[in-house]
Amino acid sequence: DIVADILKWNYKELDFIPDVITASPPCATFTTMSLTNRNFYDKSKPARVRNSETMKPLNDYAILGDNLLKRTITIINYFRKKNPKLKFVMENPRGSMNKSPFMSALRPYETATTYYCMYSDTRTKRTDFFNNFNLKLREGSCRGTELVRLVPLCKRYAIPQTLITSIFKQIENNKIKS
């Protein structure tokens, strides 16, 4: 694991070329809640951070979200050139990230969507997984027993272990085939 501020991290100095990159850009400026006039999740954050039609950021908080997304995509693309067999998966709750103009720089990619409760989690949390290896996730709908906004922050951002296991098994199976 690498834990760093990706806006400052010199990824070109990494002493190896990764086979897999997983990324979770902050969701707060891409959630559908950020397109409304209220912010249910965090009262200290601005209510409406982005224009829902143009995706234009309306404040510094949204600009930071865009910069983090752009940098994440830049890092993925840098290592894709170094390793054409690189597999990536970038997750974000279903919202407006898929409408971001910056996502075009990630192409080609596919989007798999699932609910966390499909993986025995107590949260419903519909989430998109942008990837380049034909990721298949459980489909359908379910109802979680916890509202995401009422869950402690550390749990709110956690991906269910069974979902992580499923993703990495698919990456491994895909590497064997290619």
List PLM regions with ranges.
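Conserved active-site and SAM-binding loop architecture
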Residues: 1-178
